[in-house]
Amino acid sequence: MSKPVNLVLLYGGKSGEHEVSLVSAASVLKHLDSEKYHIIPIAMDKSGRFHRHDYNDLLACSDKLPVVTEKSTPLEGLLINGRLAVDAEIVFPVVHGPLYEDGCLQGLLELAGVAYVGCDVLSSAIGMDKDMARRLACINGLKSARYKLLSWHANASERQQFCHEVASEFGWPLFVKPCSLGSSVGIHKANNMDELNAAVADALRYDEEILVEEFIVGREIELAVLENSIPCGKPRVSMVGEIKVNHPDGYYSYTAKYLESSQTDLIIPAQLNNSLEEQLKQAAANIFSYLKCKGMARVDFFVNDKTEEIYFNEINTLPGFTSISMYPKLWQATGIAYPDLLDELINLAMIHHNCRQHLVTNYL
C-alpha cells in the first residue's frame, strides 16, 4: 500500500465567510479517506493567526470545526522561510472570501512551491470579482442582469445621485451586492429608496466596490463544473440544480442559505426541457474555460421561465462544501460520491503542480 499523502486542510480565515468555512471544513474532514491522506487541519482565526490541530481530535466535530482548542498548537505563520510550516505535499483550502478566494492565498501557495486544490491565481482573482467575471463570461452574447458599480470613495452626494440613477434606470426592486464577496454576505434586496440607501451603506462595509443590479424574474439555477483530468478534455458539467427560496427574505440570503436553510429547497435535477438544460451546461463549460479555471467551480444562472432567456449570475471558484452545499450535492446526484470528488480534486491539483514543477525558471 502506498504511503498516505500529507494534506493540509486549511479553514477559517478573517473574512465575512469565516463561519461558513468551519462548516464546510467539517464536511470535507469527514469525507477525506484517512488511509489515503495524512490530514493536517490548520485553522485561521479572525485575526489571521494559524492553529494546527491533530486530525483525531476533530473527528467528533460533526457540525463545524473549531478554530482553537486546548490541544491545538499555534503556528508562527502558514509559511516559514518561504516554505509551508508543516510537512505536506498539498493544501486543500476550504476558505472563502477576500484573501483566500481571490488569488492571494493561491499566490502564496505558488511561492511556497506546494500543490493546492482549486483554481489558480488568475481565475480565482477574476472569478471573485463579479464585474470582471461578467465581462468575460458574457463575451459571446450571454446576458447578465444590468448593473452599475459604486466605489467606497464616493462621497455622500455621489452615493445619493448614484442611488437615484439606478432606481430610475432599472426600477424596483434592486439587488445590492459587494463586488468581491460570496455566501450572500452583504447582499440586500431593496424595494424603495430608503432600503436602497441602507443597503448601499451596509454593502460598503464589506467591500471597496459594490454593484447594484436590476431584478431578474426567473428561476435560480446552479451547475457544478469539474476540470477534465484528460489533457485538453472538455470540462465536466453536472446535472442542473435549482434553488427555490421560501424564506421571508424573498431571495437566497445568508439567513436563508445557512441559518434557516429549511425554508429553502434544493431541487436536483431541476425540471427543464432538454434544449434549455443543454444550453445551460454548455454555458457553464464555456465560462469555466473563458476564465481558465482549474479544478472546480460552481456557475450560477437565472432563467426566465417565459422567454427561456439565460442570465449569468456569478461563478464561485471555491464553492461551499457543507452538507447543504450545491457543489457536492450536484456531483453526488450526477454519479460522483463526495469522497471520490475530493480524490478527483486532489488528483487534479497534483497534476497541475507537477506541470508547474517542470517549467523552466532559470534562463541563464
UniProtKB/Swiss-Prot annotation:
It comes from the Bacteria. GO terms for molecular function: ATP binding; D-alanine-D-alanine ligase activity; metal ion binding. Pathway: Cell wall biogenesis; peptidoglycan biosynthesis. Binds 2 magnesium or manganese ions per subunit. ATP binds at residues 167-222. Its EC number is 6.3.2.4. SUPFAM superfamilies: Glutathione synthetase ATP-binding domain-like, PreATP-grasp domain. This is D-alanine--D-alanine ligase.
